[in-house]
């Protein structure tokens, strides 16, 4: 570690019994020792410095920080990990157990819970164990695998949140377009694309484009955002553009148009007067908007959790890694991993059907949430309309008007329609047959058709008519 210019004491002199060290020589030896100590400390704090990466692996370096710093971070990450695993496992179990929650839209929520569960499962125990020993314990291969898992599951969560925002955008602004699109099979293909996209951005460090290295207090690993080389900086720049900033812009775009659609629909409903239709349409839109707000809260918390870590990485990308301390890297990393606990907590507080399902399948947890099992069953009704109902030419209005709100756990059809989609489909069909948009009345499978002038004169209580035809392949 010593440079040629540093003061050294020849071994031949130290072995001479008559040798006496002068004060000046002792001071030179002390200065040389101090230089060695400082250089070793710099090497341990910045293992990603160019030219020193290979030396950082054997043995793994440590950072000269108080022991309580390691223990505190280790305890926090353990609590975060346990909460994330138990909470997301509850979400997965509840959504999969309840038929009324197994819809194409909720498949995205289940995927988010799966990625958050795996994030907590793969990151927290390893981080905690290394913090107890105040150094990385799992070797170079373990470091790469740990960082790879963190990258994959973090990217999957971000892209899944983007897909949720797009789903809410389509349901609220273009409900007719989603009738034939939102099937479980197509949603599964979307989720497959999400995982492949995450793998595409997580595998390059294994092949020499950037690297997975220790970071912060050197008890966790991440991709190399410190090395100031064109190849590493290019990977960091593209990663931020296509994994963070672009999805964030898409989410902002979706919610801007959701706000506009709700405002315009509210104004349109005002022209219908104080009719039951107006109230029901507004209630349906409000229901969809409540779900959109839940998704928006999850997205905002996720972005806020990753913002400090992204800032640290961008500082390293800009070439100012020398101002980053071990704490400045480790604390944001813990905050980012805490994003895995937001999803189950928010849904347990704000999602009425999820709360009711918990009360039914997990009564003990339902008591903690203040939800009664007996009272929750009616709210589990999954309101949907079969495509065959709208596509059948032989269905009459008297049969439809006899259908009341389903008090079951769900429809077995592949496509679960929301209230907004059903309203839009019926409204478009009525418009195609020359009827006014404000003249029909539809609520959860109950349809009341307007009567023609001849029917009003004859005051016929019921008239059989056929629904407009819709393609069965929608």
Swiss-Prot record:
Gene3D superfamilies registered for this protein in UniProt: Rhodopsin 7-helix transmembrane proteins
Task of the protein: Photoreceptor that binds cis-retinaldehydes. Contributes to pupillar reflex, photoentrainment and other non-image forming responses to light. May be involved in the optokinetic visual tracking response. May be involved in the regulation of retinal hyaloid vessel growth and regression.
Cell membrane keyword on record: yes
Cystines in this chain: 143-221
Main location as per UniProt: membrane
GO CC annotation: axon; dendrite; membrane; perikaryon; plasma membrane; sperm head plasma membrane
Positions bearing carbohydrate: 31, 35
Tissues of expression: Eye; expressed in a photosensitive subset of retinal ganglion cells (at protein level).
Name under which the protein is recorded: Melanopsin
Keyword list, A-Z: Biological rhythms, Cell membrane, Cell projection, Chromophore, Disulfide bond, G-protein coupled receptor, Glycoprotein, Membrane, Photoreceptor protein, Receptor, Retinal protein, Sensory transduction, Transducer, Transmembrane, Transmembrane helix
Family: Belongs to the G-protein coupled receptor 1 family. Opsin subfamily.
Cell compartments where the protein resides: Cell membrane; Cell projection, Axon; Cell projection, Dendrite; Perikaryon
Pfam families with a match to the protein in the record: 7tm_1
Protein's organism: Rattus norvegicus (Rat)
